């Protein structure tokens, strides 16, 4: 469908010229400042696609410093109707192993210093009971099954401020909250996407067990990078297969 345009947030590798046709770089400015990176625009499987690096092209922006409003505004202005956002997460559950994919359906906001809305001048209470796009989640699960990838069709992510990792006490507390995975980037990204009416779904890759699990080495940045590099090709294949399905799908459930 010609009105479908997919935004990809995160380091997915989909800006590879072999995958993205008619590729071009576009620098944009927004009323909220500059986004984290230029937009890489092109077509994947004949679907208009826009790739944005959340933490900058060289991963130089820490989670609190990401200009989430500029990022989402830039994708909305570019005409994106859907967003697939990749992220590394720590597992808070035994069953979610390093390397597993999780298509989260709920979040808990444990951030402290982030702007959570576009609405600075008027009071808007955005419905958030179902914050992620169930249609995208279904397509991702279908694609993961076809590719025989270990995945979990739903889960709750808790987003912390960072950039430090959790203490053991915090990790156990987050488990008691009902969170399944932990990261530093989903909030406020998902909230802002809902405010502008974009279908949004997180593609979370488990890289570690945070620090709650006895007998497991506490998470380090090096550990995260190692698992991500090892599974990058799986994420790329998943996104490619899912994008080919989205072009036949138009979701109205995420529109306000």
PLM region descriptions:
Residues 76-79, 175, 194:
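Non-catalytic positions within long, well-ordered alpha-helices that form the structural scaffold/packing
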Residues 81-82, 180, 199:
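Short acidic/polar active-site loop segments enriched in Thr and Asp
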Residues 131-176:
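Active-site rim beta-loop-alpha module in soluble metabolic enzymes
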Residues 211-256:
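His/Asp/Glu-rich mid-to-C-terminal helical/loop segments that flank catalytic regions of hydrolases
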Residues 1-128:
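Metabolite-binding pocket within alpha/beta catalytic cores that recognizes anionic/polar moieties
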Residues 72, 171, 187-190:
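Generic hydrophobic/aromatic pocket-lining and core-packing "Φ" positions
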Residues 184-222:
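Zn-dependent metallopeptidase/amidohydrolase metal-coordination segment
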């Amino acid at each position: 469908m010609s009105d479908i345009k997919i935004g990809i947030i995160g380091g997915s590798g989909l800006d590879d010229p072999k995958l993205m046709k008619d590729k071009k770089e576009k620098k944009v400015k927004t009323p909220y400042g500059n986004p984290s990176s230029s937009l890489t625009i092109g077509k994947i499987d004949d679907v208009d696609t826009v790739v944005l690096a959340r933490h900058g092209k060289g991963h130089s922006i820490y989670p609190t410093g990401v200009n989430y409003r500029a990022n989402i505004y830039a994708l909305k202005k570019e005409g994106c109707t859907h967003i697939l956002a990749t992220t590394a997460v720590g597992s808070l559950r035994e069953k979610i192993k390093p390397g597993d994919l999780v298509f989260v359906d709920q979040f808990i906001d444990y951030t402290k210093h982030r702007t959570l809305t576009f609405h600075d001048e008027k009071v808007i209470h955005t419905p958030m009971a179902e914050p992620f796009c169930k249609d995208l989640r279904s397509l991702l699960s279908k694609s993961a099954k076809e590719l025989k990838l270990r995945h979990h069709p739903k889960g709750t992510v808790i987003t912390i401020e960072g950039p430090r990792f959790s203490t053991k006490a915090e990790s156990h507390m987050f488990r008691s909250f009902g969170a399944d995975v932990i990261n530093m980037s989903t909030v406020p990204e998902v909230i802002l996407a809902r405010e502008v009416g974009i279908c949004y779904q997180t593609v979370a890759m488990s890289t570690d067990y945070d620090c709650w699990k006895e007998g497991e080495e506490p998470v380090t940045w090096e550990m995260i990078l190692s698992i991500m590099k090892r599974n990058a090709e799986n994420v790329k294949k998943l996104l490619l297969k899912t994008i080919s399905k989205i072009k036949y799908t138009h979701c109205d459930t995420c529109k306000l």
